[in-house]
Amino acid sequence: MIVSIRGAAGVILGALLLGSSAACISSYAAEIPASTSSDFALPNLLSAEDASRYRDIFTLEAQRKWRDADREIAALTDRLLMPEVEAQRYLSPNYRATYAELRDWLAKYADAPSASRIHALALKRRPKGEPEPPTAIVGTGTAAAASHDRPRSIGAADEAAYANGGQSQAWLAGLAAWRAGHMDAARKHFEAAAHAGASSWAISAAAFWAARAELRSGHPELFNYWLGIAAQNPRTFYGLLARRTLGVDSYIEFDPQGFGALEAQIMTGIPAGRRALALIQIGDTARAEAELRGLSLRGSNDVQRAIVALADRTNMASLSVEIAAHVAEDQDSHSDRAQYPVPRWKPRGGFHVDRALIYGLMRQESKFRPVAHNPSGASGLMQLMPGTARTMAAHTGVHGPVSDPAVNLTLAQQYVIELLNDDRVNGNLLYFAVAYNRGPNALAGVKNASKNGDPLLFIEGISNRETRLFIHQVMTNYWIYRLRLGQPTPDLDALAAGEWPIYTALDNSAEAPIRHAENR
């Protein structure tokens, strides 16, 4: 399904020419996405009895009740998950695994997620004169864990084109000429930046500004041409703005890839795929994700697409984003539904801020990883700093580890509400993004640096590159999640028209206590 969003191109064209809009652009409702349900049932590879026994075994081993666990193991009729069971035991600090146990495990299960750790332990336990144990297969253990950060690094590398070589010089020269009112020079610099751009984000940004400069410099016949260049990258900040300005479809696709008979056949034909399905059956999604993450690094294109479908189907949000981004890059095949998952986590007491904004922040901040931690000290799904978490805990009465999704979302939602209501923000989404990224005290400096009333120039005038890119990415996520949830995007209309985007609550489930005042 292509989500249809139409813009008022003539009105927006005038707004871009003048730098602000005197007209109000109405919101355009998106088509409601198709149902997420599927008639194809995930295969249950374990009998009900074995599924129950495996749950008990993992619990007993976590409690160091080895003999009780052994009795349950002896009663199993299917030993599919024994690699996980034995790895949990052998890696426990309360169990002394022998070299023979570790060597034999590696001989049978070198493709399992714990293989690298088991191999390292086996090397430590290897008696003199014994041959080295079998090695782990590439795509397990630390290699797979390292790939966990790949979506963030891909995005950073993509967007880093803003700061690379000739493209960066032309881009900065274009902005300087624009500020000085030298529009003919600005358009030439932006055109050069668009031609030199090495990423979709850089190309769409330069092309969009080239379109603006063409109007200002008296070349309206080139306006649509440069907007069309920007619009070729619909999953970027300026690409979405360009498509809204032109009044064309967003080209964001939310049809589920679907986990069906073919995907089931692919997954059940691979040991790691079978283990992942069995782990999903017993409710152990953490171990299932580890299996699928390792498999994705060594699997074929068909295997990777099957993993994307399974991750989307089973609500593995972090894995869904990670693998879908990898597939999009390597296979030029976008799965927008998988790249913009709707996780099941909720704040305590429910949502009081629209989910699109919360999900948009979460996708950028942690890629949906509850245990994400930044060297700066920020932690959890919404990357809360310790001081912020303590303050919001005092305001909400909710306490607990920020690695707990419900706790993190509850505290972060309160922080979002307080920022949006802050007199320095007053519902302005661009100011809000700055405040969330750098703290509300940073707003005074960035506001003073740009007083001409042009929201886009405000963004590009922010000296901190991380904050600029944060605004681009969070707003892009936010708009795409609006579409994912079947909602209009009035703030996209506003920004395309040269106006400041103001938060408007649209969720029926979000009784957001946000003031709706004029931006100051």
Features from the language model and the residues they span:
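Catalytic glycan-binding domains that act on GlcNAc-containing polysaccharides
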Residues: 79-92, 96-115, 121-123, 134-139, ...
